[in-house]
Amino acid sequence: MATKESKYERVEKVNVDADGATLVKNIGEDRGKEDPGMNFQDKRPANLVPGAPAGVIPNRIESLPTDRAGQRLREHLSESERLRVSRSSTSSKSSSFVEPSLKYRGEIGPIGKNGEFVASSNRQNSSSNVSSSDNSERASPASRNSNPGMNNGMTTQRTTVITESSVQGLGAQRTVPIQPHQQREDHEVITHESHARAPETTVVTIPTTRFESAQLESRRDGRTYTEDKELTIPAPVVAPQIHAHQQVNMSGGTSATIHATTDLHLASEAQINDMGPEEYERYRAKVEALARIHEDETSRKAAAYRNAVEADAELIRQTLERQHMRDIEFRKDLVESSVDRQQQEIRLEAEYAMRALEQERVNARAALDQAMASTNIDVNIDSAIGTTHSQGRVTTTSESRTSQARGPATAAVI
């Protein structure tokens, strides 16, 4: 059996119900590890009753000499009260015993504050004055152990303390034994396993619905005409008339004006008389024939010139019409090439953005895989039985390795 200064072999938990009954539960066994939650030492004062904490009546204590136990009991007696102490010891090797009954006598107050207890048993009686210190009383696990195998056949001593006082109690009140103070530290290592992801190929597909309808209608209307002008051919002047106008200024403020007109006749009257009117008619016919010949030749030349001008005008018009069609085709080709260029730019931008996002994802995953994360946890709970402190720290460290293998390049003929 464990001694006072050695590690306890079992750790127990005490639950107290509304009626004050205690229920002892076994938490675990000490297997020799350095666990502060299970390997705690008894820190009770040396002047207390062996095997029991302050303010709690022990029901099982270790075997001690009778005079030493009596000396420790006499140290707790009050000088102002007269008490009768009766002590009886019983040696037994059996683990069965009768639980003592507790009664409280004294003033009504908080639990465990200056109270007096009366314990009675069917086997032995004694008296002592025991006063609890505060609400931080601790019950020894060895004193509450009801496992008969823990005695190992050793001699035990049972002491029942009966306290009598002149103060009359107004009611029954029981001291609730609480679990001894424990400091527990939990160390938990969580291993996160990440399975290798299958290689995946992301194909960005953009659904495109294209409606194309081409209908070209070309209509050409042309008209070429020439406005003819009248050709005036003047007759040749052989001898024009002579007109003279002269003004003469004379002295004395007088002036004189002279008008003279001279008509020239090429043929003399004698010659006219000699040629006769028939000759004159022949002359006039020849002159008219020459005029008609000249007019016909001029008209023919004008028609040829007009035809050449009209042909050139038609050629210029047709050239301009072809230029119109070429302009339309050029504009259509310019629009198509501009749209194709913008599509290629958008495709390149999308590819670059996807690569950038993939790189960001790889960097973020690598940073998280190789990073160390820690969290400090501090819990403080104030309750009726005291203040509970719980502190912890969670640290996560991960490391990952990624390998990439590239196969031979393959070319597909489209």
UniProtKB/Swiss-Prot annotation:
Miscellaneous comment in the UniProt entry for this protein: Trehalose, a disaccharide essential for several organisms to survive drying, is detected at low levels or not at all in some tardigrade species, indicating that tardigrades possess potentially novel mechanisms for surviving desiccation involving tardigrade-specific intrinsically disordered proteins (TDPs).
Alphabetically ordered keywords of this record: Coiled coil, Cytoplasm, Repeat, Stress response
Domain notes: CAHS proteins contain 2 repeats of 19-mer peptides designated as CAHS-motifs that comprise each two octapeptides connected by a tripeptide.
Composition skew (Low complexity), residue ranges: 86-101, 120-134
Statement: the UniProt record of this protein carries the keyword Ribosomal protein: no
Role of this protein: CAHS proteins are cytosolic heat soluble proteins that seem to contribute to the anhydrobiosis in tardigrades, but their specific mechanisms are yet to be identified. It is possible that protection during anhydrobiosis might occur via the stabilization of vitrifying small molecules such as sugars, but not via the direct glass transition of CAHS proteins themselves.
Main location: cytoplasm
Protein name, as recorded: Cytosolic-abundant heat soluble protein 89226
Region (CAHS motif 2): 342-360
Family under the similarity heading: Belongs to the Cytosolic-abundant heat soluble protein (CAHS) family.
Cell compartment(s), UniProt: Cytoplasm
Annotated stretches, region: Disordered: 27-155, 388-414
Record GO cellular component, one term: cytoplasm
Gene: CAHS 89226
Biased composition annotated in UniProt, kind: Polar residues: 142-155, 388-405
Coiled coil segments of this chain: 341-376
Compositional bias of kind Basic and acidic residues: 27-45, 69-84
